[in-house]
């Protein structure tokens, strides 16, 4: 059986398709559509009807792909932009009515908690997962005693549009200072992954990360597109994402920075996988 997930993010909409059996789940295909909801939300406070219609059109395109793959089980979630827009509930209903499928707007803490489905979330103590999106940044740390999750309203699109607040930076700094230093930062999201790929690296030391990200920041958007083949919606926000990663890494005295292809759409699919197959188990 194949299943799928759709993640309506702040900078793009993404979907992933998986092949499953009762004992396994395997990634097949991913789709990404550069629809920036954060522009409406952080500039105007609301998601416009035109932008919502773009979301609907995109979901319908994904659903056609699902039909071609005989997929009837899929989940749709929305994150920071949908959380922050003043018309969140009306926007959700508008989309649900059009597509005849539930849309779940998840909180920042739920977004952080979903990182637990990452296959390496249980291994090693001295690492921190940082999921940096367009509108928010989520953290996941698993210690022997507890799991720590946090969410902050700092993100690549939000910061680019100067909608980040000094108080939120202070809140982040205070929290980072309250936790033990970590050796390894595992970055989640297209910006950190694209940056490392553009530099031909799977991981970097903090010093190398700082030097190369500063070098990148000296290029304008067009130069980034030409030299590194970044998409336009990546090239204009990547410096802002890397600035947040740099701040976090320096506060925690991180030794190495790496990335993962994992994202919310993976976690949502894994969660759906468990729900579907556990429902087939009978208890007598």
Write out the residue ranges for each language-model feature.
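Active-site neighborhood of HAD-like aspartate-dependent phosphohydrolases
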Residues: 4, 17-20
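Helical "lid/coupling" subdomains associated with nucleotide-phosphate turnover
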Residues: 17, 40-71, 79-117, 121-126, ...
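Conserved ATP-binding subdomain of kinase catalytic cores across diverse folds
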Residues: 25-39, 67
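Beta-strand initiation motifs
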Residues: 23-28, 146-148
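Short, glycine/acidic-enriched loop or turn micro-motifs at the edges of active sites
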Residues: 10, 134
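Acidic, divalent-metal-coordinating active-site segment for phosphoryl/phosphodiester hydrolysis
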Residues: 135-141
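Short glycine-aspartate micro-motif
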Residues: 3-7, 127-131
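Short N-terminal binding/cap micro-motifs at the start of the first secondary-structure element
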Residues: 12-14
């Amino acid at each position: 059986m194949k299943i799928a997930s759709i993640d309506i993010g702040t900078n793009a909409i993404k979907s992933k398709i998986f092949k499953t059996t009762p004992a396994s789940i395997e990634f097949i295909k991913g789709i990404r559509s550069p629809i920036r909801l954060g522009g409406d939300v952080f500039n105007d406070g609301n998601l416009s009807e035109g932008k919502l219609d773009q979301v609907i059109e995109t979901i319908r395109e994904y659903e056609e792909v699902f039909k071609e793959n005989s997929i009837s089980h899929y989940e749709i979630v929305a994150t920071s932009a949908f959380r922050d827009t003043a018309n969140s509930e009306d926007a959700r209903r508008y989309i649900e009515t059009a597509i005849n499928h539930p849309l779940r707007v998840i909180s920042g803490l739920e977004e952080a908690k979903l990182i637990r489905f990452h296959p390496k979330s249980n291994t090693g103590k001295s690492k921190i997962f940082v999921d940096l999106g367009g509108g928010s940044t989520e953290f996941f740390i698993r210690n022997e005693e507890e799991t720590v999750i946090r969410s902050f309203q700092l993100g690549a699109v939000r910061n680019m549009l100067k909608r980040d607040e000094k108080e939120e930076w202070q809140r982040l700094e205070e929290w980072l200072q309250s936790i033990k230093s970590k050796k390894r930062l595992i970055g989640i999201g297209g910006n950190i992954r694209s940056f490392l790929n553009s530099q031909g690296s799977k991981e970097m030391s903090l010093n190398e990360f700082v030097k190369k990200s500063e070098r990148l920041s000296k290029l304008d958007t067009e130069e980034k597109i030409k030299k590194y083949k970044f998409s336009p919606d990546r090239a204009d926000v990547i410096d802002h994402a890397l600035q947040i990663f740099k701040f976090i890494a320096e506060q925690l005295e991180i030794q190495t920075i790496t990335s993962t292809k994992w994202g919310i759409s993976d976690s949502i699919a894994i969660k759906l996988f468990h729900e579907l197959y556990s429902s087939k188990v009978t208890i007598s």
